[in-house]
């Protein structure tokens, strides 16, 4: 019993060297490939594409060169905006050309939204996220639902209660790792099991990649116009906004074709 009390005291002690930090969910576009012209070239591949053309040495200029050459043939081809609108809005929609482009997003999101995004395995091609199994999460990032503060004294009370609950969970998380390792448990097992003290509002960093078509699927199902949870809707809207904000607006006509 004496040993149990000693362990309990160690677990309850504050761990001031770990920084609790409340954060909004955030999204950044790390990289991308493609644009309106690439979608058009992919659509024209079935009818007009001639790869015998002399292409520029700059590989990044070849999509535009192909687009210009195909349109210059003048065989009653639609303009790029008209073609993309036709593809997105025909019945049934022909969206495979929109899969040619690629986005890579970095994000800091809470666990609940991370789990929801994992269900979209068709739209999202790839996910890598930091793992509490392989490292001790030292930053203790967490999310608090700010809209609770709009609901008077009770909303504020539970907002503060959630914050205290989260901080306590983080203390127990670090305390459990230290105490269990000290008791002889392997550090890997201590880390992977102590994470059960982390709540659904614990945030993690992740990298996700998807095509333009995948992003539009995600937007249609999880954007702010949908009945989705506020947090995932905000993340999806931020992803779309990051694409809108790319210098030169290379996806302008593709976004318009989907009414975005």
What do these predicted ranges mean?
Residues 2-260:
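Family-specific signature for flavin-dependent thymidylate synthase
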């Amino acid at each position: 019993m004496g040993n149990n009390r000693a362990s309990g005291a160690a677990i309850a002690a504050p761990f001031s060297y770990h920084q609790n930090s409340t954060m909004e969910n955030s999204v950044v576009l790390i990289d991308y490939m493609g644009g309106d012209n690439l979608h058009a070239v992919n659509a024209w591949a079935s009818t007009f594409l001639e790869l015998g053309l002399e292409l520029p040495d700059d590989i990044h200029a070849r999509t535009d060169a192909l687009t210009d050459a195909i349109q210059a043939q003048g065989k009653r081809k639609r303009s790029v905006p008209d073609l993309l609108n036709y593809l997105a809005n025909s019945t049934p929609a022909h969206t495979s050309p929109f899969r040619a482009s690629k986005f890579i997003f970095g994000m800091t999101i809470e666990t609940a939204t991370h789990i929801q995004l994992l269900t979209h395995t068709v739209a999202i091609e790839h996910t890598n996220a930091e793992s509490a199994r392989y490292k001790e999460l030292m930053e203790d990032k967490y999310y608090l639902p700010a809209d609770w503060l709009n609901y008077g004294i009770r909303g504020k009370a539970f907002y503060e209660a959630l914050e205290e609950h989260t901080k306590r969970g983080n203390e127990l998380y670090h305390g459990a790792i230290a105490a269990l390792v000290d008791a002889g448990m392997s550090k890997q097992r201590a880390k992977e099991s102590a994470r059960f003290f982390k709540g659904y509002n614990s945030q993690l960093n992740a990298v996700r990649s998807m095509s333009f078509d995948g992003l539009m699927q995600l937007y249609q199902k999880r954007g702010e116009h949908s009945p989705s949870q506020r947090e995932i809707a905000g993340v999806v809207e931020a992803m779309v906004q990051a694409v809108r904000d790319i210098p030169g607006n290379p996806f302008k006509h593709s976004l318009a074709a989907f009414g975005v």
